[in-house]
Regions:
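Sec-dependent signal peptide recognition
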Residues: 2-10
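A short, amphipathic beta-strand motif
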Residues: 25-32
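Short, acidic Ser/Thr/Gly-rich low-complexity loop/linker segments typical of extracellular
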Residues: 53-76
Length: 157
């Protein structure tokens, strides 16, 4: 009977253990005016270890990803997660205004989720519900206004 109870006690541990080891992280890139996803955007992620920690040998600490049709890029953290994580997306600066880089503590990302810097926008054009779930980084880009597009060639240098 005791052996049966031991095995029965191990079942929840085996069931809950694997999701804790390889935590999935999703990076979403959206249009701040309407909430639509930005597709085919380059996303770069750096895993930053503290105090001499190193990523596993079979895991690259510098990832290069691309958003899919839903505006998402996904990856899994290694079994020994980094203390911090840096993520940035490269958008066309002639069309988009974006604070598209974040440096976050991995613990905060897994527990709460992170919303990147939101570019300033006119209140009537902003997309209100900007929230990130646990394990999610949300980066918001805003299309340039007509005036910003007209002035862009003069200020880009």
């Amino acid at each position: 009977m005791r052996t049966f109870l031991r095995y029965l006690a191990c079942i929840p541990l085996l069931w809950l253990g694997p999701p804790c080891l390889a935590q999935a992280v999703t990076i979403r890139v959206i249009n701040g005016n309407n909430g639509q996803p930005l597709q085919k955007q380059k996303v770069f992620v750096n895993l930053l270890y503290d105090d001499g920690g190193r990523p596993p040998e079979k895991y690259d600490a510098n990832l290069s990803l691309e958003t899919d049709n839903a505006g998402e890029a996904q990856f899994s953290l290694p079994a020994s997660p980094p203390a911090h994580l840096a993520a940035q997306v490269h958008v066309d600066s002639a069309r988009w205004r974006c604070g598209c880089g974040v440096l976050v503590a991995t613990r905060d990302l897994i527990q709460k989720g992170i919303v990147g810097p939101v570019p300033p926008t006119e209140s009537r054009n902003s997309f209100a519900p900007i929230k990130a779930g646990p394990g999610q980084i949300l980066l918001v880009a805003r299309p340039l206004s007509i005036w910003e597009r007209l002035l862009y060639p003069f200020v880009k240098n």
